[in-house]
C-alpha cells in the first residue's frame, strides 16, 4: 500500500497534504480514493481493466471512490465497467461498493447519492460483506434513515 493511501486511511491530513504537494503520479486506487477524475480517466483510457483491479490491501477502485465520497469517480468507474458487486479481497472485511457507499464517512446526502448510484448500476442490496454485515446494517448503524429507506425500496431485506 502506498504512503499516500496509508496516510488517508489513518486520517493523517497533514501527511496527505505533504505527499500530494509533491504532485505524485497517482495510481488507479489513489485517483479513486482522492476523486482525481482526470487522472482516473487517463488510467482507464490506458487500460480499462484497471476498473476491476484490486490493491495490495484488497480494496478495489470503486469501493475506494464510494467510501471516500467521490460520486463522479464512482460513476466513471461504473461507466467503464467496474463490477458493482465485486467484493474486496481482504480476509476479514470483503466489502462491495454498496457497503462502502452506505458506510461512507461524510454527510447523509452524499451517502444517499452514492448508494443510489450503486443501486442504479445493479448493486445487490442484500449482498453480505464478510461477517454477514449488509448495506442496510451500515445505514442503520449510521442512523441514516433515508439510505435505509432507499435500500428497502430497492429490495433490501429488513
Regions found by a protein language model. Give the residues of each.
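Ankyrin-repeat boundary/"N-cap" motif
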Residues: 1-6, 23-30, 52-64, 87-104, ...
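Leucine-rich solenoid repeat scaffolds
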Residues: 2-14, 20, 128-158
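Ankyrin-repeat intra-repeat helix-capping/turn positions
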Residues: 11, 35, 69, 105-106, ...
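Conserved ankyrin/ankyrin-like repeat signature
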Residues: 15, 39, 72-73, 110-114, ...
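Ankyrin repeat domain, specifically the short helix-to-loop turn at the C-terminus of the second helix
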Residues: 18-24, 42-50, 75-83, 114-124, ...
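Hydrophobic repeat-domain scaffold segments
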Residues: 23, 30, 36-42
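Conserved long hydrophobic alpha-helices within structured protein cores
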Residues: 34-38, 71-102
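Ligand-binding grooves and catalytic loops that recognize ribose/phosphate and carbohydrate rings
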Residues: 55, 60-63, 69-76, 80
